[in-house]
């Protein structure tokens, strides 16, 4: 029975008296998704083999054979010729079996001093480190596209909103720079997350370490890690780094989703602030006139998908005792899907933003509604000596009067403003120059400080952001 089981290919089959059922094989196998780690598995194995040879644990000739075999396997994987087998369960055993078929006993010696527990933890970290670097680069591409659009619209005025009600005029460039700030923080978070990803678990073996005289620091250097995980139990069971990545990815998608929501609103014919290029939109199977902003809508939807992966992995980890448990096999698909979602989203948005057509006349017309310069009038009165709360109340009276007259503050004469302000003997604080603060241009220009919406400040912020890129 033992020899019969051994032919089945399980690395542990000699322990059992009957073969695994086909249903259980399918249920427990991970090869059809974790094969994505194959090239990183080879990278880690080559570094491990080099360490084993350096330490005299295996012969140099065996190391050379392992390298020869792995080089061939890498080529087979890259060309699509490698045959992945369900019976071999996962990426690690598939590669090891092929290596042994190619180089014989040298391949059987590769697993000396390690376990699949520390092996897979190493593979995931190598893969995730690479993906983080790609995501940081894509965030840079998107920020660059936003900066270009912001620079073109540093003077374009639109209404700023709170509660989706007109609040104060801002420039479109300033509005876009808010997203540059968000995506800059996202890049910083990813870079910080990378620091904790970039620790080597290999050498922890199954959970307790190994009795072989290994050199973990050598392997860490070979693989570009900043150092080693300091506790073997934690090294094989830790998925904090994966959860942290999913949290950072969720914030990226949060910011994409907020931007998407605004794009959808701005593109609505009822608003008409922008148009999105046709190649990022779809039509309707029944309504011939439709041009739907499907890309931002779908990005908004995919954000919930990424949130789900974060919640799923947190739930996966919350009840596990030390050390490694089979539950952890479920850590990979959420990571893989999140990376694919974030990468595709950032690529598409970096391509979509340069093609956004801005409609400044519509933006300006909207900013002229809703008393967007009311705060400027209050500030005008404060600068003439009125306490802010009194100024606030006076302007509120004026706004109410404008509501009744169906006009804007700027439409009232100086005398009318004095009359409706309710200021009584202080109404003379409203001078003949009052209309200068009720213009959109005057309003945005007055916010001329770091972080303000004045065009000069927007251009300075753009220059600083370009330098940071």
From Swiss-Prot:
UniProt key word Nucleus: no
Top EC class for this record: lyase
Subcellular compartments: Cytoplasm
InterPro entries hit by this protein: Arg_succ_lyase_C, Argininosuccinate_lyase, Fumarase/histidase_N, Fumarate_lyase_CS, Fumarate_lyase_fam, Fumarate_lyase_N, L-Aspartase-like
Pathway note: Amino-acid biosynthesis; L-arginine biosynthesis; L-arginine from L-ornithine and carbamoyl phosphate: step 3/3
Keyword Cytoplasm: yes
Entry keyword set: Amino-acid biosynthesis, Arginine biosynthesis, Cytoplasm, Lyase
Top-level taxon of origin: Bacteria
Catalytic activity: 2-(N(omega)-L-arginino)succinate = fumarate + L-arginine
Gene3D superfamilies from the UniProt entry: Fumarase/aspartase (C-terminal domain), Fumarase/aspartase (Central domain), Fumarase/aspartase (N-terminal domain)
Cellular component aspect of the GO annotation: cytosol
EC number: 4.3.2.1
NCBIfam families: argH (TIGR00838)
Protein name (database record): Argininosuccinate lyase
Protein's organism: Cupriavidus metallidurans (strain ATCC 43123 / DSM 2839 / NBRC 102507 / CH34)
Name of the gene this protein is made from: argH
């Amino acid at each position: 029975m033992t020899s019969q089981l051994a032919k089945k290919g399980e690395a542990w089959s000699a322990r059992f008296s009957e073969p695994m059922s086909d249903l259980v094989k399918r249920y427990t196998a991970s090869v059809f998704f974790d094969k994505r780690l194959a090239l990183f598995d080879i990278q880690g194995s080559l570094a491990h083999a080099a360490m084993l040879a350096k330490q005299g644990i295996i012969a140099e000739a065996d190391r050379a054979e392992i390298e020869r075999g792995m080089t061939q396997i890498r080529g087979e994987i890259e060309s699509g010729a490698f045959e992945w087998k369900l019976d071999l369960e996962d990426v690690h055993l598939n590669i090891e079996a092929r290596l042994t078929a190619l180089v014989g006993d040298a391949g059987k010696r590769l697993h000396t001093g390690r376990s699949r527990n520390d092996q897979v933890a190493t593979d995931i970290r190598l893969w995730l480190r690479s993906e983080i670097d790609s995501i940081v680069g894509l965030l840079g591409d998107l920020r660059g596209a936003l900066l270009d659009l912001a620079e073109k619209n540093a003077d374009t005025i639109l209404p700023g909103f709170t509660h989706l009600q007109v609040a104060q005029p801002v420039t479109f460039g300033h509005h876009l720079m808010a997203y540059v700030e968000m995506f800059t923080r996202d890049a910083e978070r990813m870079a910080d997350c990378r620091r904790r990803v970039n620790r080597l678990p290999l050498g922890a073996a199954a959970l307790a370490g190994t009795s072989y005289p290994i050199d973990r620091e050598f392997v860490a250097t070979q693989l570009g890690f900043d150092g080693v995980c300091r506790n073997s139990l934690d090294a094989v069971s830790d998925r904090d780094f994966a959860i942290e990545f999913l949290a950072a990815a969720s914030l990226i998608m949060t910011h994409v989703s907020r931007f998407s929501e605004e794009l959808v609103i701005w593109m609505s014919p009822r608003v008409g602030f922008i148009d999105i290029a046709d190649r990022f939109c779809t039509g309707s199977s029944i309504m011939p006139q439709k041009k739907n902003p499907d890309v931002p809508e779908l990005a908004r939807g995919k954000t919930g998908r990424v949130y789900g992966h974060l919640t799923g992995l947190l739930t996966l980890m919350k009840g596990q005792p030390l050390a490694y448990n089979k539950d952890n096999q479920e850590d990979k698909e959420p990571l893989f899907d999140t990376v694919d979602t974030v990468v595709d989203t950032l690529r598409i948005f970096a391509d979509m933003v340069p093609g956004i057509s801005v409609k400044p006349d519509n933006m300006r017309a909207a900013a002229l509604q809703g008393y967007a310069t009311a705060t400027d009038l209050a500030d005008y009165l404060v600068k003439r000596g009125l306490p802010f709360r009194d100024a606030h109340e006076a302007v509120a009276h004026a706004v109410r009067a404008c509501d009744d007259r169906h006009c804007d503050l700027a439409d009232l004469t100086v005398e009318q403003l004095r009359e409706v302000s309710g200021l009584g003997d202080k109404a003379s604080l409203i001078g003949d120059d009052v209309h200068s603060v009720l213009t959109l241009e005057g309003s945005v220009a007055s916010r001329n400080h770091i972080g303000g919406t004045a065009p000069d400040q927007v251009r300075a912020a753009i220059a600083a952001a370009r330098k940071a890129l």
